[in-house]
A protein has these predicted regions:
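Short glycine/proline- and aromatic-enriched beta-strand/turn motifs that initiate or cap beta-hairpins
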Residues: 25-72, 188-200
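Gram-negative (and chloroplast) outer-membrane scaffold detector with strong preference
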Residues: 61-142, 150-156, 189-200
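Extracytoplasmic loops and strand-loop junctions of Gram-negative outer membrane beta-barrel proteins
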Residues: 41-45, 126-132, 173-176
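Cleavable N-terminal export/targeting peptides
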Residues: 1-32, 197-200
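Predominantly the C-terminal beta-signal and adjacent terminal strand-loop region
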Residues: 150-200
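Generic short beta-strand segments
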Residues: 42-44, 76-78, 163-166
C-alpha cells in the first residue's frame, strides 16, 4: 500500500512538470550577462514510506551561468532533523539545469558536499533515532531535485521543487543492534525565490 502511494506521488509530480507551458515569452528569462543566479529556498521533508525522517531546511545558492540553461556554484544551508533532534550546516557544490530558456521552465538541481553538526541531542541511547557520539571523518551530503521556475520579472523568479536529500550519519541500526553508517533520506517539498543582481 505504501509503495503504491509513493508511485502515485511521483507520477503526480511528473505530470505537473510535463504540463508546464514551455512556450512562454522568450525574452523574460535570465540573461547570463546580468549577474550570477542567487537562490534562497525553504524545504520541508515529511515521512513517506521508507522516507520517515522529517527535515526542514533553509538554503542559499550562488551560481554562475555557463550558458542560458546551465549554472554551477556553491551553497550553504541549515537543516533540522526532527526525529534525531539534530541540526546540520551543509556546504556543497550546486548546479541547476533549466530545460527551456523561457519565462516558465522545468529544472533539475544537483547538490554535493559535506555538512557539520552544530547540535545533536539524541546520542548513544541505543534507540531507533539515536546517533553515535563519534561520527565518521567525512559527513557526505547530496541531493537531487526537480521542479519548475516562473519569472515574475526578467531578473526574479519563483521556484517550486521536490527533492531527495541524503545525509551520511553513524546512526543506530535496530536490526543489528549497533551504530553503523547509514544514508538517511529526506523527501522534501520546496519553494524558493531566485534572482540576479548586477556584478553579484
Amino acid at each position: 500500500m505504501c509503495g503504491n502511494n509513493y508511485k502515485k506521488f511521483f507520477k503526480s509530480v511528473l505530470i505537473v512538470l510535463l504540463a508546464v507551458p514551455a512556450v512562454s515569452q522568450a525574452q523574460s528569462s535570465y540573461t547570463p550577462g546580468n549577474g550570477c543566479l542567487n537562490v534562497v529556498s525553504l524545504t520541508s521533508g515529511f515521512g513517506l514510506c521508507d522516507y520517515e525522517i522529517q527535515c526542514s531546511s533553509l538554503n542559499y545558492m550562488h551560481e554562475k551561468f555557463l550558458n542560458e540553461n546551465l549554472t554551477i556554484g556553491a551553497g550553504v544551508g541549515y537543516s533540522y532533523h526532527k526525529q534525531y533532534r539534530l541540526s546540520t550546516i551543509p556546504v556543497y557544490v550546486s548546479t541547476h539545469f533549466f530545460l527551456f530558456d523561457k519565462r516558465c521552465s522545468p529544472f533539475i538541481n544537483l547538490r554535493l558536499g559535506s555538512f557539520g553538526m552544530i547540535r545533536k541531542k539524541s546520542t548513544d541511547t541505543n534507540l531507533k533515532y539515536s546517533l553515535a557520539d563519534e561520527q565518521s571523518d567525512f559527513n557526505l551530503f547530496f541531493s537531487i531535485g526537480a521542479g519548475f521556475k516562473y519569472h515574475i520579472t526578467p531578473r526574479i523568479a519563483l521556484m517550486a521543487s521536490v527533492s531527495d536529500d541524503f545525509y551520511l550519519l553513524k546512526a543506530y541500526d535496530t536490526r543489528r543492534n549497533d551504530y553503523r553508517n547509514k544514508l538517511l533520506g529526506n523527501l522534501c517539498l520546496g519553494i524558493a525565490i531566485s534572482f540576479q543582481i548586477d556584478n553579484w
